[in-house]
């Protein structure tokens, strides 16, 4: 998993380890690391291309770029768009009026659309 590490107090590329905390790598990357430990490599980097190059050298098969829908320097094999069911992207507006970082029409770049917060019905 490659994340920018929003609001972290450091810069550059960091491969997460037990010595890191939310201040050095950001809150979401530390959650990923704590959940998956040694099963998944978690990195933070402002430069996603450099991080991908490191992973290519390490022969990583799958790279998940967290919050990278707007990342134009990387050509993804697959784009996944997540949207809250309580505030779906198609009823929202671009920031600062709404919560969207891009125009709604750009949802057409998504290969998959996942709505979070949906009720699950069992029969």
Language-model segments: what does each one mean?
Residues 6-123:
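Phosphate/Mg2+-binding loops and adjacent switch elements
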């Amino acid at each position: 998993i490659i994340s920018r590490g929003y609001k972290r107090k450091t810069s550059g590329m960091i491969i997460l380890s037990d010595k890191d905390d939310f201040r050095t790598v950001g809150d979401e990357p530390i959650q990923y690391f704590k959940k998956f430990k040694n099963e998944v490599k978690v990195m933070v980097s402002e430069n996603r291309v450099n991080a991908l190059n490191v992973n290519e050298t390490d022969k990583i098969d799958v790279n998940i770029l967290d919050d990278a829908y707007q990342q134009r320097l990387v050509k993804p094999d697959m784009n996944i768009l997540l949207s809250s069911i309580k505030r779906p992207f198609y009823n929202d507006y671009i920031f600062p009026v709404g919560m969207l970082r891009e125009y709604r029409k750009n949802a057409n770049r998504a290969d998959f659309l996942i709505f979070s917060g949906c009720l699950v019905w069992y029969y």
